[in-house]
């Protein structure tokens, strides 16, 4: 009986192995992983030269076997399914509190955020340099600052992850202490966890009209009202960045955006390119891999990019329906992409700056932006201030 069971087990194992080999052999290679938001390695070119090649980091070369190993990992059959099994085993079977620093609480995916003191201080210094170079002596320049809390601010304590997260109160206090020249706008009283996507880092545009109104009021403007907009739901289902990182199978969510005649008629220029009409990039409102006529692909993998399109260092939004000549300059990260359109109705022109994407850094900003007689808003999330070095 024991021999029979062993024989059956061996047949099952061999059968599974043959099935995986067959699927791997006959399936076409994937170009891009939408769950991981990354390109997948193709089969490496097989030549005598790269067979003999050794890994050499100084020359940026890899051996055939190194490239082949990366290819097999990326193109492994049912890769996403095995990633999900692994994640569920760690979180549910082993009862681990997180998966690589990411966790789920009350249906919301987020990550632990210990303080990165070095990056945080460098970013405060970068903001100070911008102030001293462009804002301090600019005539009639009104400077404001607001910090957007990440989801862990709301979830760390109830989920039991507060000991492994930074002291948010101290973080906000340090920002204010290092930027005494700015008029600080506290957003904590108009935000809660329901204002954020469940599977992504960002906030939901349809839920932050009150945030935009508080910012506008603090800057002396009337601000938007909910009735100024109609809500439009995008057709495709939205899966945020945490969906692929945590790898636990959960339902996607709807992505809504706010429409108005004012927003539809705005003229938007990205990095000096000719202006286009409207603040939304409808090509990016879907999830697909689009082949280019001359080879390669256009990847539309993050539906959040519908807001002010792709990452750009300098975006100019002109409002032809403005009843004022006031102008606003916003230094921002990706959170600003969905919020800034809500401020358009109170300004004739909004210049949007993301210093991370400006070629050559910020030392020549005054060639493109005049800061005199402007409202200037520094709008950064705790995520970026704590993890990504600003230029």
Question: Predicted regions span which residues?
Answer:
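Extracellular glycan-modifying ectodomains
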Residues: 1-391
């Amino acid at each position: 009986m024991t021999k029979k069971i062993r024989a059956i087990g061996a047949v099952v194992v061999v059968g599974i192995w043959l099935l995986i080999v067959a699927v791997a052999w006959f399936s076409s290679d994937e170009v891009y992983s939408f769950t991981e938001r990354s390109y997948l390695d193709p089969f490496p070119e097989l030549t005598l030269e790269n067979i003999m090649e050794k890994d050499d980091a100084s020359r940026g070369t890899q051996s055939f076997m190194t490239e082949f190993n990366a290819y097999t990992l990326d193109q492994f059959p049912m890769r996403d399914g095995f990633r999900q099994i692994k994640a569920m085993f760690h979180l549910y079977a082993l009862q681990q509190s997180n998966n690589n620093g990411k966790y789920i609480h009350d249906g919301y995916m987020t990550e632990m955020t210990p303080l990165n003191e070095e990056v945080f201080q460098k970013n405060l210094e970068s903001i100070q340099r911008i102030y001293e170079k462009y804002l301090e002596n600019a005539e009639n320049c009104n400077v404001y600052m607001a910090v957007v809390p990440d989801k862990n601010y709301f979830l760390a304590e109830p989920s039991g992850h507060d000991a492994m997260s930074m002291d948010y109160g101290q973080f906000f206090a340090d920002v204010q202490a290092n930027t005494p020249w700015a008029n600080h706008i506290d957003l904590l009283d108009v935000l809660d966890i329901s204002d954020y996507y469940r599977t992504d880092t960002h906030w939901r545009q349809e839920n932050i009209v009150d945030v935009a109104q508080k910012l506008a009021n603090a800057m002396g403007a009337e601000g938007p009202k909910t009735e100024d907009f109609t809500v439009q739901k995008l057709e495709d289902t939205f899966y945020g960045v945490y969906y692929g990182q945590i790898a636990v199978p959960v339902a996607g969510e709807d992505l809504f955006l706010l429409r108005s005649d004012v927003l539809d008629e705005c003229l938007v220029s990205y990095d000096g390119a000719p202006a286009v009409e409207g603040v939304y990039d409808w090509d990016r409102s879907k999830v697909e891999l689009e082949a280019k006529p001359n080879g390669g692909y256009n990847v539309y993998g993050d539906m959040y990019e519908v807001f002010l399109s792709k990452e750009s260092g300098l975006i100019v939004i002109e409002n032809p329906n403005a009843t004022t000549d006031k102008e606003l300059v916003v230094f921002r990260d990706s959170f600003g992409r969905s919020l800034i359109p809500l401020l358009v109705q109170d300004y004739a022109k909004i210049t949007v700056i993301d210093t991370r994407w400006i070629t050559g850094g910020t030392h020549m900003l005054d060639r493109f932006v005049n800061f005199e007689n402007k409202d200037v808003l520094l709008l950064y999330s705790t995520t970026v201030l704590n993890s990504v070095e600003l230029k």
